Amino acid sequence: MRRLTDSFILGLAKGAVIPGLYTFRMTEGRSPLGQIGVLITVAISFLLTFKRFDPRFYKPIGDFKIVFLSLMAPKLPSLLSAVVMICLIFSEMRLRMILSRCVMIMPSYSPAVFTGIMVSLFFKSQMFDDYSVLITAASLLPITVRYGWMIRSSGFLLGLQKYRPILKSTSFREVDLKCLVKFTVEFLLLFTMLWIGKMFLSMPKSNHLFFLTVVNNVFFKLNVFKAAACAVVAILSGLMMNVCLYRIIFEAFVGLGFSSIMLTLSSDLKDRSFYAGDLLNGFFCLVVCCMYFGV
């Protein structure tokens, strides 16, 4: 029961932390240069947090306070809002990276993690916009309170023994980069499809929570190339008939393609590299950037 609860708590927090979502809202209506600055900040924060934070010595209360205070002050003078934006992105990136590592290390239940993500994303929908700060805080509070006990549990400590890079001095070069080539090609294909879909389909600015829910799917895999082919059909159908249903179908197939990459990557790299969680987190952040920024 404890594993089930901890898995749900991890999912609840992962669904609440979407790096760049609230920061993009702060930059709406600003110049393209400002939005490019957001992308650069996201990239820098990912590189700075990569490999640095050990889950055993991490305290989420610091990032919880930064995220909460940042979300309470969305309308600030330009200079001050830029500082808040940088702090918010860095904390979101660091928190989500730790969560991704913990999900990989712990003997967690994938359906429980996915359920937590769905619950969190549901309450982040537009119908609850007036309570977004409160909902984010409520989603992050359980992991903030429970985290200390979680990393001292026998399951976490046993899982950690499989991740040699954190237990001795090693480098990211121990990860077999050759196995990532296939995933990278598939990811770039779906990334391109998502970009094309944003250009040609009617995709209004929204939370895209349905898409993010599908991306986090853990129940079944779909061949990436089949998903891309179905997405092309959805784009062409949407151009001819201009029905919003095709946008939903497009998001569903592209999302399933991304989730298939992440599921395969997770099963192939789990127990081999401590950085597998970081790679999954990096892929997710790239998907979020493509969906929320640009076209």
UniProtKB/Swiss-Prot annotation:
It comes from Human herpesvirus 6A (strain Uganda-1102). It is a multi-pass membrane protein. It is found in: Membrane. This is Protein U26. The chain crosses the membrane at residues 4-24, 31-51, 66-86, 103-123, 183-203, 218-238, 243-263, 274-294. The lineage of its organism: Viruses, Duplodnaviria, Heunggongvirae, Peploviricota, Herviviricetes. Its main location: membrane. The keyword Transmembrane applies. InterPro entries: Herpes_U26. Keywords: Membrane, Transmembrane, Transmembrane helix. The keyword Transmembrane applies. One of its GO terms (cellular component) is membrane. It comes from the Viruses.
